[in-house]
């Protein structure tokens, strides 16, 4: 059984939701990034969603854009990101790991080579934020070849056909976006139709649903679980802690530990 499948099965038995933090690899630098990831996992993160530093990220608000810049200024490269992933996987052999990135980064490596490298370092799933449903085939063919689960986004304004196609094509989990726009904790509003979207996705037997965008408080985690999703992804709120404390590594790790514990507690 694949790692995400195993995770959701275990959480269902425990009657828990998943808490999945997002961070940018190598933010603020390679060494601190690994310590940050360790802290997240050791304090309750059920899985990780990780980004590769990129100069023009899609969907990212100012907080995650700044994280990309910190990593790039520190000299992080795609090779360094894969190196860090190797270290994470060797430390946590059962941890589900998903990548969230842009198509241009994949193209820069070559599609097949990118998925091959993902498989070599133990990545479980890949979500390409700017990959349209109608243009996914060359990516999903390579994902299947290297046993990588290709994840797709269900937007809040999805029509019935889009909901059906997302449910049928996404693997590992379904990424449900809380609202339109870019990531960020400033806008914590959610679309009014999310409960209906969850019901429709489940009607088409979509993989477990993780909701993301604007989730920064434990109460929000509890609230999204009540509408039937299987877990919550928190990116900007997690990265904001790194932004605030990256010059004080110990304070950064302490704040991240406390944040992760509270967010995970809200899934029970």
From Swiss-Prot:
Gene3D superfamilies: Aldolase class I (3.20.20.70). Pfam families: Trp_syntA. The active site is at 49 (proton acceptor), 60 (proton acceptor). Keywords: Amino-acid biosynthesis, Aromatic amino acid biosynthesis, Lyase, Tryptophan biosynthesis. This is Tryptophan synthase alpha chain. The alpha subunit is responsible for the aldol cleavage of indoleglycerol phosphate to indole and glyceraldehyde 3-phosphate. The keyword Amino-acid biosynthesis applies. The gene is trpA. Belongs to the TrpA family. Coiled coil: none annotated.
